[in-house]
Swiss-Prot record:
Pfam families: Anticodon_1, tRNA-synt_1, tRNA-synt_1_2, tRNA-synt_1g. NCBIfam families: leuS_bact. This is Leucine--tRNA ligase. Its EC number is 6.1.1.4. It comes from Rickettsia typhi (strain ATCC VR-144 / Wilmington).
Length: 828
């Protein structure tokens, strides 16, 4: 099988089988899998993702589309830098070596990529365009720098996004995260929050789960900003944001974030306050707030109620108010908010109910002075109007989404093209001096960014005044590169950032395939970038991905030895119901079935399994055992079964090719109907990504043809036609063996160039159908009925079946439930 696979991979390469032109006379289809990080080896999770995309690409080609199916590398990132530190090498050497190795792995799997369009994000010829684009955005004031409180990883010595902090620790290093103020560069994604939110509903071919996640991440809240005067400091106020201002008479405290400016201005920091602030600083995202026990500490300050000067409210630093949402301050209404209630109970604060029901059971305001009797919506508008009349508040909209911090304090990334001059201030690098490339002579003898300490690269002359200046030593967040790469595939040799003519033809991406873990960062940033690129006339679209498919993960059992060390599956052998170490024969504990990961070693080596079976067998298994959107559990017996199926096809060819047409002595109409039925439904299944169901249908057709061969009287012509069709249907899934059999069947045209089989509508109606026969809901038999039979006849036949009579034992059934053409359930 390996020789066959190598043969066809060589032919495809020589014939430039998957090299596609920008031919606008043809209907286009752009299918794209998320580009991988070149970590060293392709894993089975990657293979599932790419196999799904390859089925779609090959199928759409056979449907007559001009298909763009490219591949590239998301090549910047921290792992390369860490590898350089560990191995005393250069990140670029490690990265390019991995790319070369992983590319060979992908080619060995027979994926139909147009490798002439390959991109590499660490190539200066790629990232020079994003440096120029950054400067264009800077000129439009869509880029700015400010001092910001950041999550600092003291081990990796870099800033982490909130999403990269898990339970207060760095997602890679595991170090406890510190809070620091650093100058950071930001992109104004919040300028586009409303459009990003509104257009989600137009993404009809995206999973609902992803759309909801993006909506929640953007997090639009409509309410009011208003001010509370601080008692004894009545020239000072605390501004709060509220989505429920109608509950203002139920307020019992003001909650502020641990880093609210008022703390530095007016509050005397006791040890209790200082310790609480330190504790709060470890909470980095709102998802952690929900899990945290609600706590607070009194500041010593009070504010005056805006509508009743006799009501004085304490100001409390809380662990559930964030400075980067709203104003960093809220008024707490414990009777009508779960978090406020939890804190009020703990701190013995008043709990005043201000919403009740009237005699019609409609919610109305109570205990609220001039708001009493109004509905919540009426009261809300009246309160906001009152704030505006008094000049202490105004209507406002807040978003959970914050501007995108793009600065990273690492070497292996795209340099930010900015120069700092004592005379001229911030100076953009002139376009003619792009790209700003990374130096080759760097030292990784400590964990600090080597750009910061480089003796020559950092020091330059100012482009404006020619005096001494220094470069920006931060690099771009690596999401910067992956936010526009899909546009570069349209023409990766374009002089500018994009080839607008090619982009107009290919974009948007028709189907984008990748993991749901990218729902709110990569996918949101890519949508944002597309809008920016549209405004700069690089692309004509404002949404990058017409369709999105999120595949499930590949799972495997985990194993540990007696010393609690993780073991690879290849190191473990099963004996009965127990597991043992292959070399030491010591007992091994099987743990949970989890996502394959290097850290827990529950990974399958691609080359080992490929050598044992074949690329086609791997492709078939990762597509057949579970719906593509669901998780897949790796199974040795499963891939073994797929390998047997492929060998069965080869054996069937040997038998079928020996059959002579003059041996035809039986017309099998039902087999012919099944062939046309399979053509139609396999095509439909591929279009809806029901790939496991498509494979099941093709297995059914395979078995039907195999059974026909075994009969004394056979329909040779239908068998040969059906086998030809079967090989064609299977080609997008297992391309190597099907190309081989197709050629041996005498077909002159390459299979990858052929037109997908067409079905005859008139052949789709079957003269019989099979029904399941149940007794008390349990399957006891099946029976094949003619399509023209009545329901009464169906019931009569089923109760008289020998297997059913055994359960009836001479009695009459109490009831017969019939689901037409599917199930008969006999109740006794």
């Amino acid at each position: 099988m390996h020789k066959i696979e190598q043969k066809w991979q060589k032919i495809w390469k020589e014939e430039k089988a998957f090299q596609v032109s920008n031919d606008s006379s043809k209907p286009k289809y752009y299918v794209l899998e998320m580009l991988p990080y070149p970590s060293g080896k392709i894993h089975i999770g990657h293979i599932r993702n790419y196999s799904i995309g390859d089925v779609i690409a090959r199928f759409m080609t056979m449907q007559g589309f001009n298909v763009l199916h490219p591949m590239g590398w998301d090549a910047f990132g921290l792992p390369a830098e860490n590898a350089a530190i560990q191995n005393n090498s250069r990140p670029q050497d490690w990265t390019y070596s991995n790319i070369e190795y992983m590319k060979k792995q992908l080619q060995s799997m027979g994926f139909s990529y147009d490798w002439t369009r390959e991109i590499n994000s660490c190539d200066p010829q790629y990232y020079k365009h994003e440096q120029k684009f950054f400067l264009e955005l800077y000129d439009r004031d869509l880029v700015y720098q400010k001092e910001s409180l950041v999550n600092w990883d003291p081990v990796d010595n870099t800033v982490l996004a909130n999403e990269q902090v898990v339970n207060g620790r760095g997602w890679r290093s595991g170090a406890i995260i510190e809070k620091r103020y650093l100058n950071q560069w930001f992109l104004k994604i919040t300028n586009y929050a409303e459009e990003l939110l509104n257009e989600i509903q137009n993404l009809k071919d995206w999973p609902e789960a992803v759309r909801v996640m993006q909506e929640e991440w953007i997090g639009k809240s409509t309410g009011v900003n208003f001010h509370f005067k601080i008692k004894y400091h009545e020239n000072s106020t605390i501004e709060v944001f509220s989505t429920k201002p109608e509950t203002i008479f139920g307020a019992s405290f003001i909650g502020i974030a641990f880093n609210h400016p008022i703390i530095e201005q007016l509050i005397f920091k006791t040890d209790e306050i200082a310790n609480f602030i330190t504790k709060c600083s470890y909470i980095t995202k709102s998802s952690e707030l929900e899990k945290s026990e609600k706590e607070g500490v009194f500041t010593g300050l009070y504010v005056i109620h805006p509508f009743d000067a006799n009501i004085i409210l304490p100001v409390i630093i809380t662990n559930f108010v964030l400075m980067d949402y709203g104003t960093g301050a809220i008024f707490g209404c414990p009777a009508h908010d779960k978090r406020d209630h939890e804190l009020a109970m703990k701190m013995n604060l008043p709990i005043k109910k201000v919403i009740g029901t009237d005699n019609t059971q409609e919610e109305v305001l109570i205990n609220s002075d001039w708001l009493n009797g109004l509905t919540s919506s009426e009261a809300k508008q009246k309160v906001i109007s009152k704030f505006e009349t008094l000049g202490i508040g105004k209507r406002s909209v807040n978003y959970r989404l914050k501007d995108w911090g793009i600065s990273r304090q690492r070497f292996w990334g795209c340099p930010i093209p900015i120069i700092y001059c004592e005379t001229c201030g911030i100076v953009p690098v002139p376009y003619k001096d792009l790209p700003v490339t990374l130096p080759d002579d760097v030292s990784f003898d400590n964990n600090y960014n080597p750009l910061e300490h480089h003796p020559s690269w950092k020091h330059v002359n100012c482009p404006k005044c020619d005096n001494h200046a220094i470069r920006e030593t931060d690099t771009f967040d690596t999401f910067f590169e992956s936010s526009w790469y899909f546009t570069r595939y349209c023409n990766n040799n374009a002089v500018e950032m994009t080839d607008s003519k090619a982009c107009n033809y290919w974009l948007p991406v028709d189907k984008y395939i990748g993991g749901i873990e990218h729902a709110v960062m990569h996918l949101l940033y890519a949508r944002f970038f597309t809008k920016l690129m549209n405004e700069h006339h690089y692309v004509s679209i404002r949404e990058p991905f017409k369709g999105l498919f999120t595949q499930g993960m590949v799972l495997h059992a985990t194993y540990k030895d007696e010393n609690n060390n993780w073991l690879y599956p290849a190191e473990v052998v099963k004996n009965g119901n127990e597991f043992f170490h292959k070399e030491t024969n010591t007992r091994v504990v099987q743990g949970r079935i989890e996502k394959m990961s290097k850290s827990k070693k529950n990974i399958i080596d691609l080359e080992t399994i490929q050598e044992q079976y074949s690329a086609d067998a791997i492709r078939l298994f990762v597509l057949s055992d579970s719906p593509p959107e669901k998780d897949l559990q790796w199974s040795a017996s499963g891939i073994e079964g797929c390998s047997r199926f492929i060998h069965k096809l080869d054996n069937m060819f040997e038998v079928i090719s020996s059959l002579k047409d003059d041996m035809n002595n039986e017309i099998n109409t039902e087999l012919n109907r099944l062939i046309h039925f399979t053509i139609k439904h396999v095509a439909d299944d591929i279009k809806t990504f029901s790939l496991n169901r498509a494979i099941a249908r093709m297995r059914t057709l395979t078995n039907a043809i195999y059974c026909e061969i075994s009969k004394d009287k056979i329909d040779v012509r239908t068998i040969k036609y059906g086998f030809n069709v079967l090989i064609q249907l299977l080609n997008p899934f297992i391309p190597h063996i099907t190309e081989e059999i197709w050629q041996k069947l005498g077909n002159k045209e390459r299979l990858y160039k052929s037109v997908f089989a067409e079905f005859d509508d008139s052949m789709l109606e079957f003269s019989t159908y099979i029904m399941a026969v149940q007794v008390n809901g349990k399957l006891r038999d099946t029976y094949e009925f003619n399509t023209d039979i009545s329901e009464d006849e169906v019931k009569q036949i089923t109760v008289n079946l020998p297997k059913i009579q055994k359960f009836l034992a001479g009695k009459e059934p109490n009831k017969i439930i019939l689901v037409p053409r599917k199930i008969v359930n006999i109740i006794i």
